[in-house]
Regions:
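Non-heme Fe(II)/2-oxoglutarate
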Residues: 1-91, 96-98, 102-108, 144-147
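Catalytic core of non-heme Fe(II) oxygenases with the double-stranded beta-helix
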Residues: 96-174
Length: 176
């Protein structure tokens, strides 16, 4: 997949996968490294370094809005959603924006988010994680270490209730 292209699996809620630019990734990392405001008390992660961004609206939203517009376009045109279910133009209100610096043996358990849409970006992924993932897939009956999994509904016969994959650096997922 190339920057600007996207793909989403057909199951439950619409999940849009795309790739963010290197400059956006770097800005998020640079600003994330500046903040040291601990945010663990608000998050589900079993991660030691989870920090909330401060004063991000002016630089973040201009970069992020085109992704929301792509989500809206795909919801209406590819997914068959109704325009009435998405307010236009977008009224963007954010609760918080945070960054996780996740290390070996740390993880995010299954959890949910508030709001109409949520997203996750993978800004930096160690090469060793892909190797570890490949090794563990040969031993265990799962997709291995470092994956992200989206759930929707019940696990019933002939029903795809989840999607799981190992993300790449720069991947972003937006979901309802």
């Amino acid at each position: 997949m190339k920057e600007g292209e996207f793909w989403f699996p057909y199951w439950g809620a619409l999940v849009l996968k795309t790739i963010v630019s290197n400059s956006f990734k770097e800005k998020l990392l640079t600003e994330g490294n500046k903040t040291k405001t601990d945010f663990r008390h608000k998050l589900a992660g079993m991660i030691d370094k989870e920090f909330v961004y401060k004063d991000y609206e002016d630089w973040f939203f201009p970069e992020f809005l085109p992704f929301l517009e792509t989500y809206q376009h795909q919801f209406i045109n590819a997914w068959g959603g109704e325009l009435e279910t998405i307010k236009t133009p977008f009224e963007i209100t954010s609760s918080n924006l945070w960054i996780n610096f996740q290390k070996k043996n740390e993880y995010n358990p299954r959890h949910g988010h508030s709001g109409d849409l949520s997203f996750v970006m993978f800004l930096k992924i160690p090469d060793e994680l892909k190797k570890e993932n490949e090794k563990k897939q040969l031993v265990h009956n799962n997709r291995g270490s470092g994956t992200i999994k989206f759930h929707y509904g019940e696990n019933l016969p002939f029903n795809k209730h989840a999607h799981e994959e190992l993300p790449n650096e720069g991947d972003m997922f937006i979901k309802r």
